[in-house]
Design a protein with these regions (language model features):
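Conserved C-terminal helix/tail region of periplasmic/extracytoplasmic solute-binding proteins
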Residues: 51-53, 389-439
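A structural signal for short loop-to-beta-strand junctions that line the ligand-binding cleft
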Residues: 111-112, 117-120, 148-182, 209-214, ...
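Hinge/lid segment of periplasmic solute-binding proteins
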Residues: 49-62, 125-177, 187, 192-198, ...
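Glycine-centered hinge/linker elements that transmit conformational signals in sensory
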Residues: 198-199, 239-269
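Extracytoplasmic "Venus flytrap"/periplasmic binding protein-like
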Residues: 86-153, 161, 183-190, 279, ...
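Extracytoplasmic/periplasmic substrate-binding proteins
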Residues: 73, 82-83, 129, 220, ...
């Protein structure tokens, strides 16, 4: 019996030791010994936060003494100052907004980032992030990745991602759609067949009356590639070694493009931005494929609406090219947690709607796009609907070797109805590959 008693005591002692080890491990795990952002249920003032911007945002705590600098373009400065003030009120972090043209921010980050002279947060168009990532200038959107992916339209996520890693906090989007003159067309045609039927009764070249126009450049003519399952580069335009411009889908799309010549009896080179803008202003052009940047040119002269592009004959929604602007965090920032918090805060549904109200920027946030303010705007809602069927314009530097040969192919195929589409595109791809190798 005594032996059994001693064994029980040893067993109990061993159990106690094991329990202590388990509890110590649990406490270590709860203490958060990783190198990630500090987690708390209080904001920078030590006050537990609400849920209006999301619970995850409230858990991150800005670094003590944090202060931020944001670069913003001229047309966005006043709006951004309001966002900075709201952020400071919520987190106790002052935000200075410095004006810098959007096209200059990436270059300035490259020169000023390593010397700690650049802004903590900046806005970049999506075709500039590849170079910035390769140079190690941007921090990934890691703390808010899951929330960002769920909240933003897919094309904006794709455009803010490089090599499988999400870096951006999408801010606004843009694509082109179809302006239509409501005095000539009370309802926008939904298919190219309907456009062709209207053109038969409306076109009068001698009077400069045309049913529809678009510029014959790669940006505006991409629908005849993407809508037919064609592509420029493989792997969602990330693999320049896989050229799809002479593939089956693109050939089908360009043959369809060639068949549309009767609805626009003009040579491709004659369809310029200035020509179609003037004709639409004069009420002679019924439909004009263009972007939101042209709204101001028409609002005082034309009773117009904006609709999605006509469906392809295969029934697919017509795929356009799009551009995306996102907030990015400078990898050299002294306050990476505060900077992440600000980028997430500024890209929220509420703030994207405020940006729309003040500047007309089209939201990248799905719920913002469905807000009555957007849905009831007959102009912006048309662009937002088309954006849902868009793909980001390729961000690879190799795309620069594509545009001129592709435009030449459009012109050959359009101006010469008997041109062999496959042979033309084979030659185009050969020219592009040669150009890529020479750079």
């Amino acid at each position: 019996m005594r032996k059994k008693t001693r064994l029980d005591r040893k067993t109990r002692g061993l159990v106690l030791v094991l329990l202590c080890i388990v509890m110590a491990a649990a406490m270590t795990a709860c203490s958060g010994t990783s190198n990630g952002p500090e987690v708390s249920n209080k904001n920078s003032n030590g006050v537990a936060g609400g849920n209006e911007q999301g619970a995850e945002e409230e858990e991150l705590v800005p670094e003590e003494g944090a202060k931020l600098v944001v670069w913003e373009s001229k047309e966005q400065v006043d709006y951004m100052k309001k966002i900075g003030k709201a952020f400071e009120e919520k987190y106790g972090v002052p935000v200075a907004v410095e004006e810098l043209a959007g096209g200059e921010q990436g270059a300035r980050l490259a020169t000023d980032g390593p010397s700690k002279l650049a802004a903590d947060i900046l806005t970049l168009p999506h075709d500039q992030i590849g170079q910035a990532v390769k140079a190690g200038l941007l921090l990934p959107n890691d703390a808010f990745e899951e929330e960002t992916r769920a909240a933003m339209v897919e094309a904006a996520i794709q455009a803010s991602t490089y090599d499988g890693v999400l870096y951006g906090y999408p801010k606004s989007v843009e694509t082109y759609a179809m302006f239509y003159n409501k005095d000539l067309l009370p309802e926008a045609p939904e298919t190219w067949e309907e456009v062709a039927a209207f053109a038969k009764t409306y076109n009068a070249p001698g009077q400069n009356k045309y049913a529809i126009m678009w510029e014959f450049v790669g940006y505006y003519t991409y629908p005849f590639i993407g809508s037919f399952d064609g592509y420029i580069f493989g792997k969602d335009n990330t693999d320049p070694s896989d050229m799809g411009l002479n593939g089956e889908g693109t050939v089908e799309g360009f043959e369809f493009l060639q068949s549309l010549r009767p609805i626009l009896p003009m040579d491709a080179a004659d369809v310029t931005y200035d020509v179609k803008t003037q004709l639409f202003q004069e009420g002679k052009l019924a439909m004009n494929i263009d972007g939101p940047w042209s709204v101001g040119a028409f609002k005082d002269d034309v009773n117009f609406g904006v609709a999605v592009l006509p469906k392809a004959p295969n029934g697919n929604p017509t795929t356009s090219f799009s551009g995306v602007k996102s907030y990015y965090v400078n990898s050299y920032t002294n306050y990476p947690v505060a900077a992440r918090l600000f980028a997430h805060f500024a890209s929220s549904k509420e703030n994207q709607l405020k940006n729309y109200e003040q500047t007309g920027a089209i939201p990248a946030h799905k719920e913002a796009g469905e807000d009555p303010m957007i849905k009831n705007d007959p102009i912006i809602s048309g662009f937002f609907e088309q954006f849902k069927h868009s793909v980001p314009m390729p961000a690879l530097s190799e795309i620069n070797a594509v545009w001129d040969p592709l435009r030449a192919a459009f012109m050959t195929i359009w101006d010469n109805p008997s041109a062999d589409v496959k042979q033309t595109l084979d030659q185009t791809v050969a020219t592009i590959k040669a150009g890529m190798q020479s750079k």
